[in-house]
UniProtKB/Swiss-Prot annotation:
<comment type="subunit">
    <text>Homotrimer.</text>
</comment>
<feature type="site" description="Transition state stabilizer">
    <location>
        <position position="36"/>
    </location>
</feature>
<feature type="binding site">
    <location>
        <position position="10"/>
    </location>
    <ligand>
        <name>a divalent metal cation</name>
    </ligand>
</feature>
<feature type="binding site">
    <location>
        <begin position="134"/>
        <end position="137"/>
    </location>
    <ligand>
        <name>4-CDP-2-C-methyl-D-erythritol 2-phosphate</name>
    </ligand>
</feature>
<dbReference type="GO" id="GO:0008685">
    <property type="term" value="F:2-C-methyl-D-erythritol 2,4-cyclodiphosphate synthase activity"/>
</dbReference>
<feature type="binding site">
    <location>
        <begin position="63"/>
        <end position="67"/>
    </location>
    <ligand>
        <name>4-CDP-2-C-methyl-D-erythritol 2-phosphate</name>
    </ligand>
</feature>
<keyword id="KW-0479">Metal-binding</keyword>
<keyword id="KW-0456">Lyase</keyword>
<dbReference type="InterPro" id="IPR036571">
    <property type="entry name" value="MECDP_synthase_sf"/>
</dbReference>
<feature type="binding site">
    <location>
        <begin position="10"/>
        <end position="12"/>
    </location>
    <ligand>
        <name>4-CDP-2-C-methyl-D-erythritol 2-phosphate</name>
    </ligand>
</feature>
<feature type="binding site">
    <location>
        <begin position="36"/>
        <end position="37"/>
    </location>
    <ligand>
        <name>4-CDP-2-C-methyl-D-erythritol 2-phosphate</name>
    </ligand>
</feature>
<dbReference type="InterPro" id="IPR020555">
    <property type="entry name" value="MECDP_synthase_CS"/>
</dbReference>
<feature type="binding site">
    <location>
        <begin position="102"/>
        <end position="108"/>
    </location>
    <ligand>
        <name>4-CDP-2-C-methyl-D-erythritol 2-phosphate</name>
    </ligand>
</feature>
<dbReference type="GO" id="GO:0019288">
    <property type="term" value="P:isopentenyl diphosphate biosynthetic process, methylerythritol 4-phosphate pathway"/>
</dbReference>
<feature type="binding site">
    <location>
        <position position="44"/>
    </location>
    <ligand>
        <name>a divalent metal cation</name>
    </ligand>
</feature>
<dbReference type="Pfam" id="PF02542">
    <property type="entry name" value="YgbB"/>
</dbReference>
<feature type="binding site">
    <location>
        <position position="12"/>
    </location>
    <ligand>
        <name>a divalent metal cation</name>
    </ligand>
</feature>
């Protein structure tokens, strides 16, 4: 197969004091996200999408929250590891698109830094990486400011070198 599509989703609830980390960007906020790792909901969704595209399971199977070595783990490092698997299977990024669902904090001021971090970690061009954010108009858990969710979609292309 020359093309593979993956979809990922993750959610973390708010808990302790902030800041939060989204796409490797630290964002000041009154609460942090509860998680075994750094709680980067967007990069977790992206890792799931990449793993799913290659039928390699999910982030929990590769980085279990029962394993102490992943306590407080930097999700950018997890993403880079997942990308080594993508490359070892002979694929590269075609494009990726993330949708962050959060009533607060506002993501817009941080979107370009998020895109740049991802671009670096997946070895892609900036025009292959899209990150956007939306609210739920105060509906549901995100609207009540109980947590943040993220959806990720990726298209992988067979590498020319493969």
């Amino acid at each position: 197969m020359n093309l593979r599509i993956g979809h990922g989703y993750d959610v973390h609830k708010f808990g302790d004091s902030g800041p939060i980390t989204i796409c490797g960007v630290k964002i000041d906020y009154e609460q942090g996200l509860l998680a075994h790792s750094d709680g980067d909901v967007a990069l977790h969704a992206l890792c799931d999408a990449l793993l799913g595209a290659l039928a390699l399971g999910d982030i929990g199977g590769h980085f279990p929250d029962t394993d102490a070595q992943f306590k407080g783990a930097d999700s950018r490092a997890l993403l880079r590891h997942v990308m080594t698997l993508v490359n070892e299977h002979g694929y590269e990024i075609g494009n990726l698109d993330l949708t962050i669902v959060a009533q607060a904090p506002k993501m817009a001021p941080h979107i370009q830094a998020m895109r740049e971090n991802i671009r670096q970690d997946v070895n892609a061009q900036l025009n292959q990486v899209n990150v956007k954010a939306t609210t739920t108009e105060k509906l549901g858990f995100a609207g009540r400011k109980e947590g943040i969710a993220c959806y990720a979609v990726v298209l992988l292309n067979k590498s020319i070198a493969a």
